[in-house]
Structure formats: structure tokens, C-alpha cells
Regions:
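A conserved beta-strand element that flanks and buttresses the S-adenosyl-L-methionine
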Residues: 127
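Short alpha-helix
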Residues: 175-189
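Conserved S-adenosyl-L-methionine
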Residues: 191-202
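Short catalytic micro-motifs in class I SAM-dependent methyltransferases
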Residues: 130-131
């Protein structure tokens, strides 16, 4: 697949807006990419540190309602469903084609992270793994993610470090984040916020590409 062509013609930035045209472009791009298992796999290794970090921060998921925001094919949701069948997991993604791959038993909803189709405090917890980078209107997306989590609920975000920009090819709307910048956005809505550098594997020293932000509302 020609990723440069597929994701060309757009410029992200601090003042970027998710116009109807841009939203349609992003949705179409991921709809087309849904069948590319090499770039967008349906599963992940449940041993990666991302899984352990999210699970440890969210705590006991039994009987809880949890949002996977920007879930793609639901690969993280699949792992958490297998680990805790009593957890009610919801996956939201802008691409309906991506949602077709989400495993049975996981609730799905098509939509944007900037306008989550859920009531205030609907979830006990929420996480977003490498999806906030595609939300375009980052401040609004963070606000929405916090809005739908009940007071005392936990939020985990894993995404890329702006200081490493250029290390990977990206669609032109994509945004990476500074550690302190995303902390500031979360602190507007959450009473506890922390962040750390992470690696895919717990015993591998982080190379600075990935950051995790952990919050309690």
C-alpha cells in the first residue's frame, strides 16, 4: 500500500481543526487501511508492557465499563476481554471498517474522539493507545475523554513523544505530544496526573519514542 499517497495533502498543527472534509478524509484513509493486516494487525502480544501498564493503572476491571478510544480493530480490547471477561468494554473508532474486525462481545460505536457519543461519567475508566495522535483537535479530545469517565475513574494514554518527531513516517495530520504539554491538558480535568517514558517490553530501556500519561479524575 502506498502510505505516502494515502496520507498526503494534509498538514496538522496546534491550530488544526477537524473540519467535515478532514474527518471524511481521515475516515476514508483508515477504512482503506483496515484490510492491511501488516500495518494494522488485529492482535497484539499480550505480554507487551503497554498492556501491563494500562491494566495496572486501571486496576480491577471486573464488572467495570471501560472505553477503548480510537480502538482500531480492538486489539487491546481483545486482550483485556480475555483477561477479564466480566469487564464491559466499549470500542470507539472513526473507521467503521476497522470496527468490523473488533471481536464479538465488545461493544462498538463509530465516532470521533472530539465528540464522544456517550453521557457524562458513562465509563469507569478509559484508555487511548496511539489514537489521540489522530484526533486533530487534541484539547477537545482530551476534554471529551475525561468527560465520559466518572469522578474517581482512571485514564491511560499511550502515544508518541514530540521530541522524537520524524523518527517514523506519519500521516500529515498526526500530532505527537510533549510530556508536560499533555500533562497540562489532563490536569484541567483530573486531580492526579503522571507521565513516564515507556518501551514495548518492560525489560528494555525506553528509547524516548513512547510516553504514557496516567490520570485519575
Amino acid at each position: 500500500m502506498n502510505w505516502k499517497r494515502l496520507f498526503s495533502g494534509l498538514r496538522g498543527g496546534r491550530d488544526a481543526r477537524l473540519t467535515p472534509e478532514l474527518r471524511a478524509r481521515i475516515q476514508s484513509s483508515f477504512d482503506q487501511a483496515a484490510g492491511d493486516e501488516a500495518h494494522f494487525p488485529s492482535t497484539i502480544d499480550p505480554r507487551i508492557y503497554h498492556v501491563k501498564l494500562i491494566r495496572n493503572h486501571l486496576g480491577d476491571l471486573g464488572g467495570k465499563r471501560v472505553l477503548d478510544a480510537g480502538c482500531g480493530k480492538g486489539r487491546f480490547a481483545r486482550v483485556f476481554q480475555e483477561q477479564e471477561p466480566a469487564c464491559e468494554i466499549w470500542g470507539l473508532d472513526i473507521s467503521e471498517e476497522m470496527l468490523r474486525f473488533v471481536p464479538a462481545g465488545i461493544h462498538t460505536r463509530a465516532g470521533s474522539m472530539t465528540e464522544l457519543p456517550f453521557e457524562d461519567g458513562f465509563f469507569d475508566a478509559a484508555y487511548a493507545t496511539e489514537s489521540l495522535e489522530h484526533a486533530v483537535e487534541i484539547e477537545q479530545a482530551v476534554s471529551e475523554l475525561c468527560r465520559v469517565v466518572k469522578p474517581g475513574g482512571r485514564i491511560a494514554i499511550i502515544d508518541k513523544n514530540a521530541e522524537q518527531w520524524g523518527k517514523l513516517p506519519t500521516p500529515e495530520w498526526e500530532r505527537w505530544f510533549t510530556r508536560k504539554g499533555l500533562e497540562r491538558l489532563l490536569r484541567r480535568h483530573c486531580r492526579q496526573v503522571s507521565s513516564r517514558y515507556i518501551s514495548y517490553w518492560e525489560d528494555v530501556e525506553p528509547d524516548g519514542l513512547f510516553l504514557a500519561w496516567l490520570a485519575v479524575k
